[in-house]
């Protein structure tokens, strides 16, 4: 006879007597050593999560890829943004600056694609990652060469179609569990042999606009008249990411990034206006606004708006992928930094076009 744990019970008399004798011997040995059954404790296994962790914290810890970055390593995404913005500013001031900016954007797209699976915590095949990287690199190269941002939607659409096509042809054939007449009572519906095709497709497609958005850096660098805006965007992006490290909650980090971004944009624009360069920069930056509020005021307002726009772009990345201080892998942290760098130039380019530049 077996109990619910699958342990066989011995019901004959001999088995019962021998079992009772064994229990008596164990009790005598515990009494002689000064231990009682209630005082004997089995050490609990070490927990993989902190003692005060909630259920959601334990779930995130279990699903997070390793190795985890802790301590100073958790700021790797911020260091990635600082490196990319520094390289962009350096490439822009050197001869052939547009080509250098394209190379920096291509590097960021490669970092995004290689770590996208760890950042999104979803399966992304090598083919999908290659398409994501190729979409960003190709768009930056075309826009940086022609100066036409109108190529971006077309290349993004082609990339999305390519991702969907790859996912369709690599997905397994569904199992049909129904009978030929289709009247089987209680028959389960057709199911995929491998679940997650649609979530994987959605995750891969989400990376395409981020990679393609990096072409905004190439568009800013292509126009020589937008040099002040390009350097302003680099400086504000770097300062905003530093401010985004302040605090321990998403709300505090977002507020710090917004305040620091506004202050940085205001300070940089005020310095340019105080140096007397507003008359040379405003006609190519915000000509429509300059005709209404004046050149110096237009430049200062442009700096403030740049700080707000870049801050919101960085906050959006953190809102999409969770707090940047959460445990993550090295590739995921680098991909997060690349994503922040790529999207930070999109609102700046939009302001230039809306302002009449």
Roles of regions detected by a PLM:
Residues 71-73, 77-78, 251-357:
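C-terminal transmembrane helix-loop-helix hairpin of multi-pass membrane proteins
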Residues 123-134, 151-157, 179, 191-207, ...:
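Cytoplasmic-side transmembrane-helix entry/capping segments in multi-pass membrane proteins
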Residues 2-15, 19-113, 348-352:
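N-terminal signal-anchor module of multipass membrane proteins
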Residues 194-276:
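Internal active-site segments that recognize and position negatively charged phosphoryl groups
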Residues 151-227:
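Hydrophobic alpha-helical segments and helix pairs
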Residues 91-108, 148-161, 221-238, 296-312:
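Structural signature of hydrophobic alpha-helical transmembrane segments
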Residues 84-85, 104-115, 135-139, 158-167:
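Central hydrophobic cores of alpha-helical transmembrane segments in multi-pass inner-membrane proteins
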Residues 62-65, 109-123, 162-196, 239-255, ...:
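C-terminal ends of transmembrane helices
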């Amino acid at each position: 006879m077996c109990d619910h744990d699958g342990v066989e019970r011995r019901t004959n008399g001999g088995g019962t007597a021998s079992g009772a004798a064994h229990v008596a011997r164990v009790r005598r040995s515990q009494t002689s050593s000064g231990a009682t059954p209630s005082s004997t404790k089995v050490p609990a296994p070490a927990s993989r999560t902190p003692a005060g962790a909630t259920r959601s914290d334990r779930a995130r810890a279990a699903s997070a890829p390793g190795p985890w970055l802790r301590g100073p390593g958790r700021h790797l995404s911020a260091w990635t943004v600082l490196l990319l913005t520094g390289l962009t500013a350096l490439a822009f001031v050197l001869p052939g600056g547009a080509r250098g900016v394209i190379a920096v954007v291509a590097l960021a797209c490669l970092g995004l694609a290689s770590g996208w699976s760890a950042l999104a915590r979803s399966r992304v095949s090598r083919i999908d990652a290659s398409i994501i990287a190729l979409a960003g690199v190709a768009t930056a190269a075309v826009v940086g060469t022609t100066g036409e941002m109108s190529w971006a939607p077309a290349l993004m659409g082609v990339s999305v179609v390519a991702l969907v096509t790859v996912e369709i042809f690599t997905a397994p054939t569904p199992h049909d569990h129904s009978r030929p007449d289709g009247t089987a009572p209680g028959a389960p519906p057709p199911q995929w042999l491998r679940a997650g095709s649609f979530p994987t497709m959605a995750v891969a497609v989400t990376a395409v606009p981020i990679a393609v958005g990096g072409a905004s850096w190439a568009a800013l660098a292509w126009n020589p008249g937008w040099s002040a805006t390009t350097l302003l965007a680099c400086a504000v992006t770097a300062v905003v990411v530093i401010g985004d490290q302040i605090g321990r909650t998403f709300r505090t980090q977002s507020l710090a990034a917004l305040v620091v971004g506004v202050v940085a944009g205001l300070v940089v624009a005020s310095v340019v206006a105080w140096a007397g360069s507003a008359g040379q920069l405003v006609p190519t930056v915000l000509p429509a606004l300059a005709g209404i509020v004046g050149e110096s005021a237009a430049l200062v307002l442009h700096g403030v708006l740049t700080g707000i726009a870049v801050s919101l772009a960085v906050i959006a990345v953190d809102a999409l992928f969770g707090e940047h201080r959460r445990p993550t892998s090295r590739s995921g942290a680098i991909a997060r930094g690349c994503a922040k760098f790529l999207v930070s130039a999109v609102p700046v380019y939009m302001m230039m076009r809306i302002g009449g530049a």
